[in-house]
Amino acid sequence: MVKLAKGAKTQAKPKKAAPPPPKDMEDSEEEEDMEEDDSSDEEVEVPVKKTPAKKTATPAKATPGKAATPGKKGATPAKNGKQAKKQESEEEEDDSDEEAEDQKPIKNKPVAKKAVAKKEESEEDDDDEDESEEEKAVAKKPTPAKKPAGKKQESEEEDDEESEDEPMEVAPALKGKKTAQAAEEDDEEEDDDDEEDDDDEEEQQGSAKRKKEMPKTIPEAKKTKTDTASEGLSIFIGNLNSTKEFDELKDALREFFSKKNLTIQDIRIGNSKKFGYVDFSSEEEVEKALKLTGKKILGTEVKIEKAMAFDKNKTAENKKERDSRTLFVKNIPYSTTVEELQEIFENAKDIRIPTGKDGSNKGIAYVEFSNEDEANKALEEKQGAEIEGRSIFVDFTGEKSQNSGNKKGPEGDSKVLVVNNLSYSATEDSLREVFEKATSIRIPQNQGRAKGFAFIEFSSAEDAKDAMDSCNNTEIEGRSIRLEFSQGGGPQGGGRGGSAQSKTLFVRGLSEDTTEETLKEAFDGSVNARIVTDRDTGASKGFGFVDFSTAEDAKAAKEAMEDGEIDGNKVTLDFAKPKGDSQRGGRGGFGRGGGFRGGRGGRGGGGGRGFGGRGGGRGRGGFGGRGGGGFRGGQGGGFRGGQGKKMRFDD
């Protein structure tokens, strides 16, 4: 730095012979000193700088330095300044302290002090200095274009500002014109940059608005799909050839109906490609299309029905009214046909026997009558009637079923017993030998194999209680059975039967077009249905829940709809679990929570995956129960829990 200072001295000597500048120059220099002192709030050495500046402000010596001072940020185009900047930028950080001491004998001592002071100021508050200097530049000289150029240079190289102080003392004042031209060009470039920034901001704001508007348009699109259906101008087409592509199906449907001189407004194919909806322009065309059911499209016979448009209140009333005149019949032989049931229920308006994949019935049926009085009469007359040696059980569906059949007895006990620990080889006949008063016996099976338990139904709670007292721990097919009351009633309650006695079914695999009304309509005896939808789009998530008045109705509906279809989609059924009846977490130890595999937390398990792992990683496992967490901590954190931070241990 001493060499550079000497170089500055030698280059400044030829300027001593130059004629003294006009007096205006000296005045402007003093004004600049005053303005520079005012522009910096943190410059402590202000009085020291002002006094020597006035003493040494001789025309020959101070003119180059003072002319260069405002050019500190604006005259960077000077060649000498760039070369000196490159040399100093490598050593400025290490030699900043030496620079102040080495420059004491130099005649331009006030200028050096200013450079050091400005270096300290630029490190502490570059942004404030930029703003203040930019504002002061307007009132300084007749050449204010130098300051904006300095601002641009400073914004690009803020960290290298101090390196420009001394080189500018060497820069001759004669190059001020070139600097002004460069500054004007920089002003134009800055204006262009500002315009481009404004354009970018407008584009970003516009794109953000478009993104916000996107979710709003989705529900509107969904509404238009159902508009035609609500007007009764849509048909439902089932049993489509799902092996074809969506476009193939649409083209085939369009060609099929156009040959029949029918005008199509829109075609919608379900995700499974097994069904679709076709909109027409008039009711007359819909009636013509309905007559085409059973015709082949792409090699399969299609089923054509009128698309349902539901009035929620009206549908609920119709459902309740129909349930009041519909009977639910259980314990019928698997070979029973509709004709055989028609012989027993002579006044029945409609009889439905749910069937499985193999076409055989599931031991239940629904019998609908013209009015509620006929249903009541049939219930009284046909209760316990025999079909092929089996005594049938008759009850109402829906809400009315609570008044008869499966209701609890006067003492609050259930009329249904659950038989646990049942031999897999046990049959209905072997159970009937033990439970002689049973009105219905059902052995749930999985792929033709018994599940190890059964349901025994009696005509009264008293009969069920007697069977519990006399038959519990009886041996059937070599195994001692264990009895309990269904629906959590009786001395033992709960158990497998209690957990299975849910009144709500969980339905998966629903079509995106299935509504809560169609879902409820699909299950005889249901009292309510709800479909889970996406909060943002309102679209169905493909699953829902169906509520029943009793657990027995839910079980019967599950059996009836097993492997069934709703709106062309095959659905999967299961009993819904009450909230809080979850098995997450386990009970620590070597079980589902803690242990060697960790589980999901547990209660004081032994960690898992070494010391803590998954078992203690959620604040309830590890070595110390709550907040344990082992070495890895997780949310519990370390040995003592703490605030949820992981703790490190050095090797």
UniProtKB/Swiss-Prot annotation:
Which GO molecular function terms does the record list? DNA binding; mRNA binding
- Low complexity: bias regions: 1-11, 54-79
Q: Which SUPFAM superfamilies match?
A: RNA-binding domain, RBD (SSF54928)
A Pfam family (short name) is: RRM_1
Main location group: nucleus
Q: Where is the composition biased (Gly residues)?
A: 585-644
| Compartments, as annotated in UniProt | Nucleus, Nucleolus
Source domain of life is Eukaryota
Q: Where is the composition biased (Acidic residues)?
A: 26-45, 89-101, 122-134, 155-168, 183-204
Q: Where is this region: Disordered?
A: 1-230, 574-651
**InterPro entries on file:** Euk_RNA-bind_prot, Nucleolin_RRM1, Nucleolin_RRM2, Nucleolin_RRM3, Nucleolin_RRM4, Nucleotide-bd_a/b_plait_sf, RBD_domain_sf, RRM_dom
Record domain RRM: where: 233-309, 325-399, 415-488, 503-578
Question: Which GO biological process annotations does it have?
Answer: 3'-UTR-mediated mRNA stabilization
Q: Report the protein's function.
A: Nucleolin is the major nucleolar protein of growing eukaryotic cells. It is found associated with intranucleolar chromatin and pre-ribosomal particles. It induces chromatin decondensation by binding to histone H1. It is thought to play a role in pre-rRNA transcription and ribosome assembly.
Q: What is this protein called?
A: Nucleolin
